[in-house]
């Protein structure tokens, strides 16, 4: 007669956010006590943590666009610091969109979006009426420079920080206070406002934007900034919906890389066609 296999009891806790956490090993006791302590602090403490994240993002934005700090180190350091703070505040990898079981689904969504954006951009540069939208002097680059920008500088210096900040950490904190549609809208509005400072240089850097607002005189910069905030906020809503549907940060990362990095690569082609 075989003896029954005895298994250790598994402790389970449930937070106000509806997340159930299993703690099968004694080594998790410290984590469990910390999370319970955070829950016991209540709504004011969670709200203060959310405000701290927003203020940190303001500081990172100023460091980048006013102080001129190098985003190739600012992006990774900022992303790691935000993730560490989120974990310390009790957010799980699932709440942050980084749970292992969601990776494959998120990557599939991301690759699908990349294919769609590539097709749209290809049509855009082939049509003379829309080709000027790709003629950005910042990306009038040789092929090697364009590849470096698309596959290294944009992912490390831009996408890493922005995705971790808005669709991972801020998303997780907002989900403690609001319904999902409010999380999507709130994070997207803040994502739009994040682009105020870089938008101030867009009127002189992009041929299509510059010609579109040339007749507005002193209001040209206001129009560019307002349009950029609106456009990026709408893009944030789309990226947020991808994040919500897939449950993974990788889906919105795919969209972000496609719109930015493919814009650089197709911009190189557009300049060659224009020549």
Regions inferred by a protein language model and the residue ranges of each:
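Alpha-helical transmembrane segments in multi-pass membrane proteins
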Residues: 41-89, 105, 109, 139-149
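Juxtamembrane helix-loop-helix connectors linking adjacent transmembrane helices
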Residues: 5, 93-161, 176, 205-219, ...
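Short, Lys/Arg-rich, polar N-terminal cytosolic tail immediately upstream
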Residues: 2-41
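Structural signal for membrane-spanning alpha-helices in multi-pass inner-membrane proteins
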Residues: 60-64, 82-90, 121-125, 195, ...
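C-terminal ends of transmembrane helices
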Residues: 90-95, 166
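Alpha-helical transmembrane spans of integral membrane proteins, capturing the lipid-embedded, hydrophobic core
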Residues: 50, 54, 58, 76-79, ...
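Transmembrane helix-loop-helix hairpins at the membrane interface
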Residues: 147-275
């Amino acid at each position: 007669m075989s003896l029954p296999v005895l298994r250790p009891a598994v402790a389970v806790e449930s937070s106000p956010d509806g997340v159930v956490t299993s703690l099968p090993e004694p080594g998790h006791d410290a984590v469990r006590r910390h999370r319970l302590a955070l829950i016991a602090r209540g709504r004011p403490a969670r709200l203060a943590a959310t405000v701290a994240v927003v203020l940190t993002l303001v500081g990172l934005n100023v460091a980048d666009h006013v102080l001129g700090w190098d985003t190739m180190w600012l992006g990774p350091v900022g992303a790691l610091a935000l993730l560490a703070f989120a974990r310390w505040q009790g957010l799980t990898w699932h709440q942050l969109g980084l749970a292992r079981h969601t990776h494959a689904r998120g990557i599939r969504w991301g690759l699908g979006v990349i294919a769609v954006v590539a097709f749209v951009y290809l049509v855009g540069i082939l049509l003379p009426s829309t080709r000027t939208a790709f003629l950005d002097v910042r990306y009038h680059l040789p092929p090697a420079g364009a590849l470096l920008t698309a596959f290294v500088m944009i992912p490390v210096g831009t996408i890493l920080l922005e995705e971790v900040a808005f669709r991972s950490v801020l998303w997780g904190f907002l989900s403690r206070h609001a319904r999902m549609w409010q999380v999507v809208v709130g994070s997207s509005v803040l994502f739009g406002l994040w682009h105020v400072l870089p938008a101030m240089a867009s009127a002189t850097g992009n041929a299509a934007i510059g010609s579109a607002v040339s007749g507005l005189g002193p209001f040209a910069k206001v129009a560019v900034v307002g349009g950029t905030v609106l456009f990026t906020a709408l893009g944030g809503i789309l990226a947020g919906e991808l994040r919500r549907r897939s449950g993974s940060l990788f889906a919105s990362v795919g969209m972000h890389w496609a719109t930015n990095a493919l814009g650089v690569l197709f911009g190189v082609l557009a300049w060659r066609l224009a020549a």
